C-alpha cells in the first residue's frame, strides 16, 4: 500500500526538521539513540499550578461534580437494578485508545479479579469505573438517552411539588407530628409517580458502553466480557465505556475532563510505556 512504518516516518521527520525538540531528558536520550538526532531544545511538560483550584476549592468541586456523576449513575443503572450510591466509589482511566500501551488490558483484568473478590466477601462496596477513551462510535445508545429523559421527568415532577411537600413537613413538625407518606403526598402525586416508575424500569443488564461501538470485535468490549465485567446486578465492579471527548456538553455526563476527575475518587494510569511526556 506504499505506506512507511512509524519508525521510518519519525526518523525522517526528526532529521529533516529545522529544530528538533522533545518533552524530557529521557526522550531526548531515546531520540538521539533511536532517531539519530539529539534535540536542540527540551520543552519540559508541566502544569501551571496557579490555574488550578486550591485544596479547599477542590473539596467543594469534588462534592458538586460527584453529585452530577451520581445522577448519571442513577439513570444509567437504576432502571435495571439499584445499589447504594453512598457506598459506591468512582474510578476512571482517560487517554488515547491504545489498548495495551495505556494498560487498559491490565486494568480490565485487575477489575475482574477485584469484582470476584468483592463478590466472595459479599461486600457492600461497589465501584463504578469510567473508561473515558474517545473512539469511533455510532452515537449515543438510545436506551440510555431514554433512561435519562424518564429520570429527568421524574426529578422535575418531584421538584415541581417540592414546595408543597416542604410546607407539609414544616407544619407537621410545628404541630409535633411525625411526617408520614399519607400526610406528605397526595394520591394523585403517588399515582403519577407509580406510572412514571413503570416506564422508567427495564429488564436485563445496563449496557457496558454509553455509545454504539462500530467494531464488534473491539478489544475493550471483549476484555470486559472475558473478565466477567457484564454489569450484572451481583457485580460489585461496574464498567462504563464512555467513548467521546468530555467537552461538558456530551448529552449524558456533561462535565469537562477536570470536573469529571474532580468528582471521582481514583484515577488509574497503568501505562506500559510513559516517557515523562
Language-model-detected regions and their locations in the chain:
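Catalytic cores of nucleotide-sugar-dependent glycosyltransferases that transfer UDP/GDP/TDP-activated
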Residues: 1-277
Amino acid at each position: 500500500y506504499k505506506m512507511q512504518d512509524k519508525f521510518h516516518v519519525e526518523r525522517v521527520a526528526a532529521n529533516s526538521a529545522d529544530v528538533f525538540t522533545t518533552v524530557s531528558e529521557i526522550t531526548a536520550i531515546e531520540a538521539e539513540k533511536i532517531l539519530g538526532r539529539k534535540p536542540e531544545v527540551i520543552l519540559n511538560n508541566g502544569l501551571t499550578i496557579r490555574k488550578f483550584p486550591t485544596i479547599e476549592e477542590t473539596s467543594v468541586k469534588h462534592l458538586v461534580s460527584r453529585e452530577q456523576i451520581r445522577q448519571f449513575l442513577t439513570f444509567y443503572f437504576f432502571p435495571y437494578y439499584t445499589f447504594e450510591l453512598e457506598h459506591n466509589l468512582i474510578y476512571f482511566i482517560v487517554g488515547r485508545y491504545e489498548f495495551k500501551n495505556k494498560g487498559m488490558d491490565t486494568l480490565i483484568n485487575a477489575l475482574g479479579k477485584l469484582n470476584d473478590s468483592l463478590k466472595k466477601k459479599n461486600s457492600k462496596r461497589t465501584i463504578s469505573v469510567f473508561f473515558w477513551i474517545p473512539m469511533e462510535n455510532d452515537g449515543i445508545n438510545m436506551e440510555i438517552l431514554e433512561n435519562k429523559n424518564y429520570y429527568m421527568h421524574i426529578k422535575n415532577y418531584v421538584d415541581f411539588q417540592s414546595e408543597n411537600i416542604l410546607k407539609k413537613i414544616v407544619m407537621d413538625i410545628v404541630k409535633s407530628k411525625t411526617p408520614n407518606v399519607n400526610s406528605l403526598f397526595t394520591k394523585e402525586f403517588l399515582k403519577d409517580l407509580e406510572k412514571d416508575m413503570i416506564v422508567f424500569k427495564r429488564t436485563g443488564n445496563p449496557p457496558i458502553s454509553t455509545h454504539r461501538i462500530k467494531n464488534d470485535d473491539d478489544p475493550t468490549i471483549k476484555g470486559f466480557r472475558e473478565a466477567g465485567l457484564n454489569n450484572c446486578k451481583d457485580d460489585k465492579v461496574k464498567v462504563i465505556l464512555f467513548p467521546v471527548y468530555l467537552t461538558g456538553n456530551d448529552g449524558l455526563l456533561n462535565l469537562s475532563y477536570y470536573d469529571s476527575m474532580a468528582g471521582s475518587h481514583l484515577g488509574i494510569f497503568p501505562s506500559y510505556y510513559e516517557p515523562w511526556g
